[in-house]
Amino acid sequence: LGVPHSYLWFSTTPPALMYEELRKAYDTTADRIWLANCGDLKGAEAQVSFFLDMAYDIDQFNENNVHTYPARWLAKIFGEQYYDTLKDITCSHINLAFSRKPEYMGWGYWNNYWGGGEKRTDTEFSFINYNEAGRRLAEYRRIGKKAEEMLATVDKKAKPALYQLLYYPVKGAELMNRMNMTGQLYRQYVRQKRAAADDLKREATTCHDSLEIITDGYNSLLDGKWKYMMSLRQNYDGSSS
């Protein structure tokens, strides 16, 4: 959880991984007392609930249903009519983060951190080989749009909860990926002396500014009820907020 990169921004631990480890613990007689070091509860509500539900009755879960837990948990809050949408968004969000957490998109040489600053490098997602980066960004844009659409449709009283439980983590992850991988493509275009590099620079800057805006939005919800709970600083340079 420390240098060179923490992962305290979003809770993206896959339910399947949690189930695998806790099922193993339960089956090897660690079935009386479980302790969880979950850090800040804010942002990890679904995972903490999953942990407690498994502690109460682990046999209700199996490898075929654990991946739907986040969607089922959210559907209980916002309505079963949203279950299919929530399942689509949450499963994709967790799968994308499993290949690379949003907090780790800066890449860089970790050992340079000790010199006071980490040198940013390109990601290992390629815009050329199988268009890995392009497909990743397209999927993030898709689920980010679905989260926006759901935020626009839920009841006004439910909007603050949906903003912090679904919209902010999904949109934040989208923008973080877009910012870093657009920056990567920008550097490639600069090396190739392509005029379109300026457009990519503007897009990356817009993503950065949008991250600031939605984070301020989170911290100002309900007259600042969750103020200071979210910070971008740890995700850029590896330090904690």
Please report, for each region that a protein language model flagged, where it lies by residue:
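Substrate-binding groove of N-acetylhexosamine-processing glycoside hydrolases
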Residues: 1-241
